[in-house]
Amino acid sequence: MGAAVAATLGMGFWATTLLWFAIHHISWLGPWLADTARAIVGPDAVSRLEEAAYDLDDRWNRWRHRGERPAAHWSVPDAAAIGERTGENAPATSDEPPLFLPKDVGPLFREVAAKGDGIWVPVADFAEGAEPVVLYKTLIHPDPERSFAEIFIVAADLRRTRLHAVAGTIEPEASTDEGQRYVRTGLIPEAHRDALVAAFNGGFKTEHGRYGMKVDNVMLLPPRDKACAVAGFADGHLALGTWASVAPRAEELTWWRQAPACMVESGALHAGLASATASSWGTALGGGTVVRRSAIGLDASGGVLYVGVSNGTNARAMARGMQHVGASTVAQLDINWSYPHIVTFRASTTGAPQGDLLFEGFTYEDKTYLERRSRRDFFYLTRETTTPKPVAQ
């Protein structure tokens, strides 16, 4: 074992370069290499190699993009069309709640903003009765030192949608008796497919923090007291916060998934994110590592869900970007090149849903969540087919 450790740590430049290439060009190879190496030499040695690879990537990107303006990835309405949108003035129809229109917030840092930063654009969806719009997208450049750092964010109307959690076929690993008996499909249930709006990745592997999960009223892995948790009630309302704030109503929750400490909670940035070199928000990789990340957030009313996936961000930039668009509480989900993604659905030629990446450049294997079983946990959104539910009080 000692020789194996020495060999792994001594791979140096070529090993780092190989890992960098693998995680950026072959979606399955990077995770496979990392998992195989962890089994041989342990997670600490692999973490150091991963951090070296991402440091190399960051240095290359900062040199390659020096002096460049940040990119916009889609067209946005011009200033006249945008007018004085507030997110609060969309008229209602009949007796339903007002139509959903998130508030445009503009750029976080004007010196690295692209055209349209912080402007919400509607996203079409496949779900039956797909009106009114329940999903919007925007782009934020959250790091004044990196013009290439970007967060793609969607906002979902929780009055007209419901969030669901699914355990992967492998992750998170179950430690309870009931969890070990639980039958995992790694798929979106057939009964929900006509109402599908979107799906996105879940949290860390069990070995990276042992963050808990409950799904279908079955606890797979017990909760950690200081972890952040996103949780669902039977009526479809959500809770998001440190487990201590969620635990008093734990018996009412049909599912929950934990993550590292809340990046933002009740509007306040975590004290550990005062510096861009924060060392948490990634057991395998430190929070200061510049890497692809994902996060989930709720606004102060509990009526708007935010999901973000990023390129080239540290934990602080991710948290501030999510907070800027309106998230009052934010939890980081998975990180690394191969895992974060947001998928939306359209009708295929057979009429069945077909998943497509909402944002280009991320990784997604065709038919995952529908026919291809997911080894990792994930979330999906469905459009409510009943009267829109009120915002939780």
What is the meaning of each model-derived region?
Residues 165-324, 328:
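Aspartyl protease catalytic domain
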Residues 149, 225, 291, 372-376:
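Short, solvent-exposed loop/turn segments at the edges of secondary structure
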Residues 152-155, 228-232, 294-298, 340-344, ...:
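Short beta-strand scaffold segments in enzyme catalytic cores
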Residues 330-333:
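Active-site neighborhood of phospho(di)ester-bond hydrolases with catalytic His/Asp-centered motifs
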Residues 205, 336-338:
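Catalytic metal-binding/acid-base residues of hydrolase active sites
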Residues 156-160, 232-237, 266, 298-302, ...:
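Short acidic-glycine loop/turn motifs at beta-strand connectors
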Residues 339-392:
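C-terminal regions of proteins
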Residues 2-221:
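Zymogen propeptides
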